[in-house]
Amino acid sequence: MIARLHRVWWGLRQESSWGWRELATGRLRWQIDVIAYRAMAFPSVARYYKKHELDRFRVLKTKGGVTLYYRTNRGDIQGIREIFIDEIYRLPEHVKVTGLVDLGANIGLATVWLATTYGLTGVIAVEPLPENARLLRTNVRANNIACQVIEAAVGTTTGVTYFAETSESNLGHVADAGREIPLVDVREIVNELSFPRPLLKMDIEGMEGELLQSIDPVWTRKFVAMVMEMHPEIVNVGELVQIIRDQGFEYRESYEITKGYQRAKRERLFVRQEI
């Protein structure tokens, strides 16, 4: 019991989201959800949330005018913290983008943050799970973002595939068995881009290896920058980094920022060398 209480306390001290000053409405509800998220170390709390709260929608509004719809599962709460508070997708000032292709958009948190932060005029978001895609559409509509939502998994061919799901919303992945979902070839998406200076954001739970190694990675040259999460337990990160470098990108490795108890991480960034 003492060990669990210590983990909850330590987690809250690390939780930069606890004191999110940019919230205009929904702060108390958000703080309760953050406490519950950390308190799920206790089985009774986890059971209650799974039974009563897991799929309920919450609404937050920031002082900057952004509206976010989320659920009380781990993936949504953690995603808000990482993307809106820790700003893991913030780009260097010299990198100028006007559009976005978001592979693995989930409920649209990164889509919304990138589009509103950088004033993007062209946005494509790809998400395979219907329940996530519905909330993705809700979030982009709520923030007046012109976004084409593609409800499919991304791969190296077009057809159907299987998707293994989890209760945490952001950890599902393409698998040999599971829910049958549409599959779209990444090259079809890229070849139809109509906006200039696009950014690629990719978080597809290990499928990045297939997109970069199973087909010619020349498709990446369409982008002025790419920010992505790589999964070293699934892919060889060094090999993927070299593949992208060979396409003319400069690599900036992910790194961690520590401020007191708070820790934040920037994702791996690739910038075209001519920028």
Locate each region found by the language model:
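Phosphate/nucleotide-binding beta-alpha loop and adjacent structural elements of enzyme active sites
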Residues: 1-275
